[in-house]
Amino acid sequence: MRLPDLRPWTSLLLVDAALLWLLQGPLGTLLPQGLPGLWLEGTLRLGGLWGLLKLRGLLGFVGTLLLPLCLATPLTVSLRALVAGASRAPPARVASAPWSWLLVGYGAAGLSWSLWAVLSPPGAQEKEQDQVNNKVLMWRLLKLSRPDLPLLVAAFFFLVLAVLGETLIPHYSGRVIDILGGDFDPHAFASAIFFMCLFSFGSSLSAGCRGGCFTYTMSRINLRIREQLFSSLLRQDLGFFQETKTGELNSRLSSDTTLMSNWLPLNANVLLRSLVKVVGLYGFMLSISPRLTLLSLLHMPFTIAAEKVYNTRHQEVLREIQDAVARAGQVVREAVGGLQTVRSFGAEEHEVCRYKEALEQCRQLYWRRDLERALYLLVRRVLHLGVQMLMLSCGLQQMQDGELTQGSLLSFMIYQESVGSYVQTLVYIYGDMLSNVGAAEKVFSYMDRQPNLPSPGTLAPTTLQGVVKFQDVSFAYPNRPDRPVLKGLTFTLRPGEVTALVGPNGSGKSTVAALLQNLYQPTGGQVLLDEKPISQYEHCYLHSQVVSVGQEPVLFSGSVRNNIAYGLQSCEDDKVMAAAQAAHADDFIQEMEHGIYTDVGEKGSQLAAGQKQRLAIARALVRDPRVLILDEATSALDVQCEQALQDWNSRGDRTVLVIAHRLQTVQRAHQILVLQEGKLQKLAQL
């Protein structure tokens, strides 16, 4: 049997004993007397234990024990001062207290630590590890929002003004009550009403400006994240897009980026507003009555503990309800889907009983959920009413002693009603921020992903012959590395010649075209262009010299001109029309209402299939490439358009690779390559 690790507890006792010895000696004489000295002693003790245990790497075991251990005594003595009067509260020091007091302190702290551990939900250690990872994501989001810092500062400024106005309204409400309850002063009454209206209008205006700044910040962050993510996606290798579903990428670009952009402004708004509200409200409450202010904090630990217990049980019952509803749905699907079998065996009543039992389980779980909710609300309400009764009792005593007025007590009660929700927000906001930042993890993983591509090439010669050589080229797709598509291909494509690549479906013809465009990297061998590896050429230069027309051309929403000149930095209209004429696309373009500026619709939806094919060929010809790849593109062309393409080929010494099925295209080729199962089967010179 493995013994538990006692090092954290031994270290805690030794370090605490050393700190108490220091606080009992010369260091303790420097501390003030009374409650301030007691709180300062507890703070120094907490800081010392925290720092020394963290230095030794033992904080994670006993970290939650330190807070009740060090601050239980100051809190207890402070509460005694509130109930019995400050003059009779014992100004004790933990360092000079008897050992029995220390044992009681350790026992109470250990009991609270054990209770907290029992109430912790299962998987707390894994959750802590997730929060560590989320902290890294949180800091990355903050850095990503750095350009919007001026807007956030402006939003914080308006936030402070809005909160200040909201906080001052109850103050002047109390002034109005005091004026109406005493000797009526018209000038003082008018002044109080004026300031109430002024601060109401000012807080509303400031709140609107605050919301505008945060909303504008969200839109800027959203655009920045989407731009960076889209830029990163376009740089990825094609293997990434084969492994990742398009719907998932759309989800990251739309919903996840929106969640990321909303994270900082919304959480900063809630956090800063709650923080300023708590500071402002407690400032006013302390100015009215310090004793009532401390009493208002009495129910906070109990409320937080009750909420922790409720949330743990609530999450558990929600999971059980989800499972029970799924089981009930499964009964319905099985019965309806196999209705013929149910009737053939006369099992209708049996299925009804099964469904009734499943519904009964759901009903019991719903009842348990509602009962626990009611008990939780009852506990919160009883705690809240108990503290309010205690405060009203103390407030009445202070009014009788002349320390408070009716208006001051009313203002204090208004402040106390709203401050509790802001304190709870501050307690839970950090955990919520860490939990909600998880949407950024996948987005950042895409942005950080390095494409499986060689280093960018730099070759961009002024002249290019267009000699293409495949030297013992083999290839397998990244998602299927054990299934090679090409196996040791060796052939040459020469300028001025048309090479026909034929073979059955799945033989690797389109893969040859993809390798020639440097869309994939061979797993073996080399693809050479003018005796240089094709990966050494500069990206834009290569794709201006090696151009492909696919079997199913892809057009983009926009004008005819934009689609033909797609990817070119500058292209004159005359050059666009010349390419369209060479592809026999000028006839239908001239018949359009706006000519080359006519919108083709999404994916070219306004065009026929043959028209799309001609625009795709014009898009290739406008670049005047040295190497042209026709991936079964001629199959959608008529004879006249195909003849125009042959005329374009005959006007220069270009290298043309045609992936074809038509006999007419093969007969006009200078060279025929036959692929079958990734191997070159036949090489015929015509």
Swiss-Prot record:
Entry's transmembrane regions: 7-27, 57-77, 99-119, 149-169, 188-208, 267-287, 294-314, 375-395, 409-429
User: Where does it mainly reside?
Assistant: endoplasmic reticulum
Looking at the UniProt record, the site noted as Inter-subunit salt bridge with TAPBP sits at D16
Taxonomically, the superkingdom here is Eukaryota
What interactions and quaternary structure are annotated?
Heterodimer of TAP1 and TAP2 (TAP1-TAP2). A component of the peptide loading complex (PLC), interacts via TAPBP with MHCI heterodimer; this interaction mediates peptide-MHCI assembly. Recruits TAPBP in a 1:1 stoichiometry. Interacts with classical MHCI such as HLA-A*02-B2M; this interaction is obligatory for the loading of peptide epitopes. Interacts with non-classical MHCI molecules including HLA-E-B2M and HLA-F-B2M as well as PLC component CALR before the peptide loading.
Associated disease: MHC class I deficiency 2: An autosomal recessive, progressive disorder characterized by chronic bacterial infections of the upper and lower respiratory tract apparent in the first or second decades of life, nasal polyps, and ulcers with granulomatous inflammation affecting the nasal cavity, upper respiratory tract, or skin. Patients may develop bronchiectasis and respiratory failure.
What this chain does, per the record? ABC transporter associated with antigen processing. In complex with TAP1 mediates unidirectional translocation of peptide antigens from cytosol to endoplasmic reticulum (ER) for loading onto MHC class I (MHCI) molecules. Uses the chemical energy of ATP to export peptides against the concentration gradient. During the transport cycle alternates between 'inward-facing' state with peptide binding site facing the cytosol to 'outward-facing' state with peptide binding site facing the ER lumen.
Please report the name of this protein according to its UniProt entry: Antigen peptide transporter 2
Query: Which organism was this protein described from?
Result: Homo sapiens
Top-level taxonomy:
Eukaryota, Metazoa, Chordata, Craniata, Vertebrata
